[in-house]
């Protein structure tokens, strides 16, 4: 008995030391990124079999170093929204037999009906190989032809009134027809979504299918699909079906409207070409901003722990906290590769490891199993779940602060290097 107790104590001590060493190694890479101006601050949360391996923070909210990064900080998730919001509703419809993944998208999305995209299979669109445009810079179409164009020159942020907007787009003050706040001095026309965004998506060109080309256009249409299919507001439906039962309190849209203190939200870019302000508590993505901050493309905010709850549920095969959200087969269908023979590595909405690993192009470790899945975000975020090792990796940063031109997070391979540390740790402690 004494030998068993001694062995247990030694094993516990070894595990604690190993986890401490892991945290120190993660922190060193984060600090390397901060020193290289990859981001002013960041955090990593890693779980194995649902238990925390490490939760490491480094740096500050901005380079002014006024507020240190804290574990419960809330981040703009950017494109992690794609797999954390409206796609979950599509998964529900599929599970209930109400969506055929090989049916044409025009059957489910009225905006696509009668267009050059109407007959494209939904499976092809979700796998990013349908030839649809990656994105549309909707806001640029709001400027008059003789308006000053800040992308092409140094812009004086104090001269925002130099903008000349087309009718029924923006104005400087709110009114009955311009009730949607984008910024304090920028209010959007009430039907802008239908008049401009949906119209631009309908008219957008299509290239031949078969080549991988990341596109976010379908995800702009998911809020309408949810609201028309459920009779419930988009965000309200997601909260009711997923976020609230998971206990993911910070996960959601428009954080300031939900009472999250501005001091807990990490700022993103100092916008010098559209909103002319530091983006803090409002969505970074321009397209999502024009959707009133609520889109299937971008717009979600969350802490690391709350984002982890959603992906731990997916990693568990659809179950979390004694409640089943999806069948395991549904998650398997959406997180597997569908066009691997074409060299396409994507699942349905979800990102996957490259078919052939390329260290210069991958955001995940080479050790990530073919069954693993997740998504990254333009603001410097990533979440990755690996059923092969029962490992969950959450990386949150604001790499676009103060400017989206900061690229060191990619050139230094910050995320895949930290991800690789986690796999090596599992091998070293024998918990693979």
Predicted regions and their residues:
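Bacterial Sec-dependent N-terminal signal peptides
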Residues: 1-21
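Short, conserved catalytic-motif segment at the N-terminal edge
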Residues: 20-77, 98-100, 199-202, 278, ...
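Short, surface-exposed loop or secondary-structure junction motifs
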Residues: 117-370
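Short, solvent-exposed loop/turn and secondary-structure capping segments
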Residues: 55-58, 135-141, 253-255, 396, ...
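Short active-site loop at a secondary-structure junction
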Residues: 32-45, 64-127, 205-218, 295-298
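Structural recognition of the beta-strand scaffold that forms the well-ordered cores
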Residues: 43-45, 54-55, 76, 124-127, ...
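Structured C-terminal helix/loop/strand segments within mature extracytoplasmic catalytic/sensor domains
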Residues: 375-432
């Amino acid at each position: 008995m004494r030998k068993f107790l001694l062995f247990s104590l030694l094993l516990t001590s070894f595990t604690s030391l190993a986890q401490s060493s892991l945290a120190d190694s993660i922190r060193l890479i984060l600090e390397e990124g901060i020193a290289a101006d990859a981001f002013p601050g960041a955090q990593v949360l890693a779980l194995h079999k649902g238990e925390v391996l490490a939760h490491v923070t480094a740096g500050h909210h901005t380079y002014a170093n006024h507020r240190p990064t804290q574990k419960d900080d809330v981040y703009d998730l950017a494109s992690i929204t794609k797999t954390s919001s409206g796609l979950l509703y599509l998964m529900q419809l599929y599970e209930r037999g109400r969506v055929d993944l090989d049916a044409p998208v025009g059957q489910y999305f009225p905006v696509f009906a009668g267009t050059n995209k109407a007959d494209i299979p939904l499976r092809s669109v979700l796998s990013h190989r349908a030839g649809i445009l990656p994105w549309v810079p909707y806001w640029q179409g709001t400027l008059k032809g003789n308006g000053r164009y800040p992308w092409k020159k140094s812009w004086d942020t104090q001269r925002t009134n130099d903008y000349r907007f087309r009718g029924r787009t923006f104005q400087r003050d709110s009114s009955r027809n311009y009730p949607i706040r984008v910024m304090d001095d920028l209010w959007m026309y009430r039907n802008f979504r239908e008049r401009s965004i949906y119209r631009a998506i309908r008219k957008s060109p299509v290239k031949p299918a078969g080549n991988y080309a990341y596109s976010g256009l379908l995800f702009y249409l998911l809020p309408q699909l949810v609201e028309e299919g459920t009779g419930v507001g988009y965000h309200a439906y997601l909260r009711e079906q997923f976020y609230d039962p998971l206990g993911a309190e910070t996960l959601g849209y428009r954080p300031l409207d939900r009472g999250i203190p501005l001091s807990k939200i990490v700022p993103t870019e100092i916008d010098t070409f559209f909103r002319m302000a530091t983006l803090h508590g409002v969505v970074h993505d321009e397209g999502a901003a024009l959707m009133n901050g609520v889109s299937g493309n971008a717009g979600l905010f969350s802490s690391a722990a709350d984002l982890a709850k959603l992906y731990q549920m997916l990693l568990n095969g659809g179950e979390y906290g004694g409640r089943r959200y999806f069948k395991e087969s549904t998650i398997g269908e959406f997180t597997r590769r569908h066009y691997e023979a074409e060299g396409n590595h994507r699942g349905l909405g979800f990102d996957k490891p490259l078919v052939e690993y390329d260290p210069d192009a991958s955001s995940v470790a080479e050790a990530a199993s073919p069954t693993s899945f997740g998504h990254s975000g333009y603001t410097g975020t990533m979440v990755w779940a690996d059923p092969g090792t029962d490992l969950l990796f959450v990386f949150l940063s604001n790499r676009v602060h103060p400017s989206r031109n900061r690229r060191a997070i990619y050139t230094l391979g910050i995320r895949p290097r930290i991800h690789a540390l986690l796999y090596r740790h599992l091998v070293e402690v024998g918990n693979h």
